Curated annotation (Swiss-Prot):
Listed name of the protein: EMILIN-2
Biased composition (Polar residues): 149-165
Species whose genome carries this gene: Mus musculus
Phosphoserine found at: 636
Cysteine pairs bridged by disulfides in the record: 51-113, 77-84, 112-121
Length: 1074
């Protein structure tokens, strides 16, 4: 709905009559805001002192800006029911909202042509007219000058002279024109056009006179109509194809008289005043409308603040937000619970480890005490046995009187005892070794050991112990209950028997007492002789019986109220009895241990006594041996004859006989040896019992050691399987690394090939660009020979002044099209180019590889240089380019000095020389980078974004620590960046090149001034999606490129996910260096 006119770049020759007609009528004012002279009228146009220029104009447009809600009242009436109920239904509907916007359009405006000046553009550069001119007044602008706020400022084109007073074309021509034949032909053409246009102007003047005559009648008839309708016949309606736009106003020609000119001027002045008034009113209305809209916006904000925030999200977004919040809360709760659980488990493990360490220390100390005790006992036993063995060896070796059958029986027993003691000592040593190993293992807790199995084993053992204790308690309780019940039953039976016996005896006594008087005489012999003593005895017996009966009665009376069950002990009593029994068992075991220790001490004392007795026996044996030796000497003396009666008697009286004095000694020794044997047997039984207890403990320890060995074997198997798994994983990882190395090598080779292809393509592009530049130069230097006579006003030696003042405007705006390469790969590659001037081949270009290049670009990886020489092609056919120049299509860079229907064959091209590297310019290499953001980009609210995750960094041109890409070469670079804000926020960023802003980005969109939008301050920012930079920039070597965030919040995650990226690639070097 924009009120605009399509722009026209320039008025062609076929529009000249229409332009002249509109000029004759006065023309219509056109908008001339910010005029830009870009083009001028053709030289053959009539009245060349006025020219149409292209200008820009601000126009107002009504555009749709969203929608607004309104409440609509509806009657809830059924179909065909005339008496409709009065109940109204209010519904909320939406309608589009339109606002007024401004835009810039391009239109035409009349101004003085170049070379003309003056108020009416009638003064030319060399205007020496001798004929007088009538005064030509500048057409007045009847409309009021527009203010700055009015975008449609109107200006009228100037009036032109009559055809009779027009300046001839030959008067404006320059003296340095072409030959007279061309000028004469051009003048003839112009004269014909002037005659034709003069005839058309006369017809238009007659039409205007008729219109003015009809104006008088129209004003009289339609005086009550609006003033705008009065000028309806005078305003020509613009058409879409019309070169002009706007309201046309009538203009009086100077040669035509009018009687109503003053009235028309008054009407125009009144119309202008009315328009000004309406414009003022409309401005005020617009201002008032803006204020009302501002007040409405403020009222809406107040209502929203009073009612609370309105829901602007959809149902799915609300559900998604609710689910996200719940998931976040659940995640936080799970993490907190896991942290607490881990902390509790850690504390529990530490507490259990401390308890286990303490328990191991206690076990170690107790085991050490047992080891010391056993060692002491073993040492003492070894010492005693050694002493006993040393004492027994000497008497056994010497012959004595006691060597008999019993001594021969006592030797094997002593040997058996020694063997048993040896076995006990060996078992004790083995037990000590095992205990030492166990203490060494338990004293130092293993940090990597798995205590779960041990805790499980301890729990199982504790459970088994508790179960056994409970079963034992139940067994003791049942046993005690049965025993107590049996004892009570026996007691009751015994009491009943005694009571029955007492009753019987009492009955007998009473019966005897009663019958004592009647049967006194027959019983007299049976009674004792003393009646007093008998009575006393009976009374004593009766009193004793009474006492017993009283005791039994008291006992029965005490047990009767409680019944039989009352006499039984309760569970607590039984438990107490069980505890007392256990304590008694423990005391018994302790007492037995003490008794064992006492018996061992007693055994030691007996051994000492035996030692002393053996010493005494040895003394006795020595005495007996001396006596035997004396008796032998006595016999020898008696045999030799030296006998004396007194000496023989003394010898016989002194030396006892072998039978008489030796018998009591041997009897005492036999008794002592019997006592010693009995004592040793008793001690041996005690040692056996102790050995059985130790053996049971050793068997328990062996069972535990066996369980540990089984657990270790299982752990060994598990560790072996884990080792095999580890080895398999190591082999698999090694194979994967080998594959990765192979892939890296393949990628490197592919990268080299791609880089070679890329360099070749860049070199080909540079060659094509150079060829297009050469073609443009050729087009500029070639003369034109196909223009019409009306346009061929310039000679081969120069141009007209008008064209010399604007050399840049005559250049073609589009580059010439290049002939594509032949598709046949077998044929020689040729490039269709423009023929050059004759002088151009004499001066080789600075880079001769491009004009005469006939080969294809370098292939990747080729190291050699292809040297080819262009051959002369066949004659080319006539081809017309954009500027009318002939061109040999099939020939190569040949010469075309003569314009004919058929071109000559092209000359051979220049041989290709190797490219010359510009000194001081490094050869470009592969440069590209790509990085993403996975962490917080900067510590503060804004700054340079540090894209930390580098994906590609060829050439090491990007520094993730600073977030800056440094260009290594001069050339063109493609820079891209994608920035994603957090939800419900925005991001405002700048792409900076060498600390200079190149592009800006705001994800919420660009925001204009509030005066233009009529929005109140404090409007809410509209959040948008991600934003991106994507542009090609020219960078010099050493320039730094980075992304700077100036507002908002940039999204980042902690899970190695990229939402924002920054990339760049080197396209090609700067063309001036190639």
């Amino acid at each position: 709905m924009c009120q605009e006119t399509p722009p026209r770049p320039r008025a062609p020759s076929r529009w000249t009559p229409a332009l002249l007609a509109l000029l004759a009528l006065g023309g219509a004012g056109l908008c001339h805001a910010s005029s830009q002279p870009g083009y001028h009228a053709r030289p053959s146009a009539r009245n060349k002192n006025w020219c149409a220029y292209i200008v820009n104009k601000n126009v107002s447009c009504t555009v749709q800006e969203g929608s607004e809600s309104f409440i609509q009242a509806q009657y809830n009436c059924p179909w065909n029911q005339m008496p409709c109920p009065s109940a109204l239904v209010y519904r909320v509907n939406f309608r589009p909202r339109f606002v007024t916007r401004y835009k810039i359009v391009t239109q035409l405006e009349w101004r003085c042509c170049p070379g003309f000046r003056g108020p009416d553009c009638q003064e030319g550069p060399k205007d020496h007219m001798k004929t007088p001119r009538p005064p030509s007044a500048r057409p007045k602008n009847n409309l009021k000058k527009a203010t700055d706020t009015d975008p449609s400022q109107v200006s009228q084109p100037k009036k032109t002279l009559s055809p009779t007073n027009a300046v001839e074309p030959g008067q404006v021509a320059d003296a340095k024109q072409g030959p007279p034949e061309l000028q004469q032909s051009k003048v003839q053409v112009l004269e014909e056009k002037v005659v034709r246009l003069t005839r058309m102007v006369l017809d238009l003047q007659s039409t205007v006179v008729g219109l003015k005559e009809n104006l008088k009648h129209t004003i009289q008839d339609d005086g009550r109509k609006e003033p705008d309708s009065w000028l309806g016949p005078l305003h020509p309606q613009p058409t879409p194809d019309s070169p002009l736009a706007g309201d046309a106003e009538p203009s009086q020609l100077p040669g035509i008289p009018s009687s109503k000119e003053s009235g028309m001027k008054d009407i125009k002045s009144e119309l202008a005043e009315v328009k000004d008034t309406l414009k003022t009113k409309s401005d005020k209305l617009e201002e008032l409308d803006g204020k009302v809209k501002g007040y409405e916006g403020q009222l809406k904000q107040l209502q929203e603040a009073a009612q609370g925030p309105t829901v602007t999200m959809t149902t799915n977004e609300l559900y998604q937000a609710y689910v996200d919040s719940k998931i976040d809360a659940l995640r936080e709760e799970l993490m907190e619970g896991m942290d607490r659980k881990l902390a509790d488990l850690k504390n529990t493990c530490e507490y259990k480890l401390v308890g286990l360490q303490q328990q191991c220390d206690d076990y170690g100390s107790s085991y050490l005490g047992v080891i010391e005790l056993i060692g002491e006992k073993e040492a003492s036993l070894k010492k005693d046995i050694a002493d006993l063995r040393a004492q027994l060896q000497d008497p056994v070796a010497q012959p004595s009187c006691c060597n008999g059958q019993k001594s021969s029986d006592f030797g094997p027993q002593i040997k058996a005892l020694d063997q048993k003691i040896e076995r006990v000592a060996e078992a004790t040593r083995m037990l000590n070794g095992r205990l030492d190993n166990e203490f060494d293992r338990l004293s130092v807790p293993e940090p990597d050991a798995d205590f779960d199995a041990r805790w499980t084993e301890l729990d199982a053992r504790i459970n088994v112990t508790e179960k056994n204790a409970e079963e034992h308690c139940f067994y003791i309780e049942e046993t005690l209950r049965g025993t107590i019940n049996g004892e009570v039953d026996d007691l009751r039976k015994l009491l009943n028997e005694k009571i029955h016996s007492l009753e019987d005896r009492l009955g007998i006594v009473l019966q005897a007492a009663n019958s004592s008087d009647v049967e006194l005489t027959p019983m007299g012999p049976a009674l004792p002789e003393q009646p007093g003593a008998e009575n006393e005895q009976v009374l004593m017996e009766l009193s004793r019986l009474k006492d017993k009966v009283q005791v039994v009665e008291d006992f029965c009376l005490q047990s009767l109220p409680h019944g039989i069950d009352g006499a039984l002990p309760s569970v607590e009593d039984l438990t107490h009895v069980s505890l007392s029994l256990l304590e008694s068992l423990n005391d018994t075991m302790h007492r037995q241990f003490q008794e064992t220790s006492h018996s061992i001490q007693k055994l030691q004392e007996d051994v000492n006594a035996l030692h002393s007795q053996l010493n005494h026996s040895e003394c006795t044996g020595t005495y007996l041996q001396n006596g035997v030796s004396d008796s032998r000497t006595g016999d020898s003396m008696e045999a030799s004859g030296f006998t004396k009666t007194g000496e023989q008697e003394r010898t016989v009286g002194t030396v006892p006989s072998p039978g008489t004095p030796a018998a009591p000694c041997c009897g005492q020794l036999e008794e002592r040896w019997q006592k010693l044997q009995n004592q040793m047997l008793a001690e041996l039984d005690t040692c056996k019992e102790s050995a059985h207890g130790v053996q049971s403990g050793v068997s328990a320890i062996e069972g535990r050691v066996f369980q540990l060995e089984q657990t270790c074997r299982r752990l060994d198997t598990i560790s072996g399987s884990l080792q095999r798994i580890k080895e398999g994983l190591g082999k698999h990882v090694g194979s994967l690394w080998n594959c990765i190395r192979q892939m890296n090598g393949t990628l490197k080779s592919h990268s080299r090939d791609i880089s070679g292809l890329k360099n070749s393509v860049q070199q080909f592009y540079s060659h094509v660009f150079q060829i297009s530049t050469d073609l443009q130069d050729l087009v500029k230097f070639q003369p034109s020979a196909t223009e019409e006579p009306s346009e061929a006003t310039e000679g081969p030696s120069g141009k007209t002044p008008l064209e010399s003042t604007r050399p840049s405007e005559e250049a073609p705006t589009e580059p010439p099209r290049l002939t594509p390469l032949p598709e046949d790969p077998a044929g020689p590659p040729q490039t269709g180019q423009q023929p050059v001037l004759p002088q151009r081949p004499l001066q080789p270009p600075p880079l001769p590889a491009w004009p005469g290049r006939t080969g294809l670009p370098f292939l990747p990886g080729s190291s050699g240089v292809i040297m080819e020489t262009g051959e002369a092609g066949p004659p080319g056919r006539m081809g017309v380019s954009g500027r009318g120049l002939p061109r040999g299509v099939d020939g190569q860079m040949g010469q075309g000095p003569i314009h004919s229907s058929e071109g000559y064959a092209g000359a051979p091209g220049y041989p290709k020389s190797p490219p010359v590297t510009t000194p001081g310019v490094p050869l470009p290499t592969l440069v590209s980078f790509s990085a993403g953001l996975t962490q917080k980009p900067f510590p503060s609210d804004g700054g340079v974004v540090l894209f930390n995750k580098v994906l590609v960094n060829d050439g090491d041109v990007y520094n993730p620590n600073t977030g800056i890409f440094t260009a290594p070469y001069d050339g063109r670079y493609l820079i891209t960046a994608t920035l994603t804000p957090e939800r419900d926020t925005y991001v405002e960023a700048v792409l900076s090149v060498s600390n200079a802003s190149v592009a800006q980005l705001h994800t919420a969109g660009y925001r204009r001034e509030f005066l233009e939008y009529h929005r109140p301050p404090g409007a809410v920012h509209t959040c948008g999606g991600p934003g991106a930079f994507h542009l090609i920039v020219h960078l010099k070597a050493g320039d730094g490129v980075n992304v700077v965030v100036t507002g908002g919040r940039l999204a980042h995650t902690d899970f190695d996910e990229m939402y924002s990226t920054f990339s760049g690639v080197f396209l090609y070097p700067f063309l001036s260096h190639l």
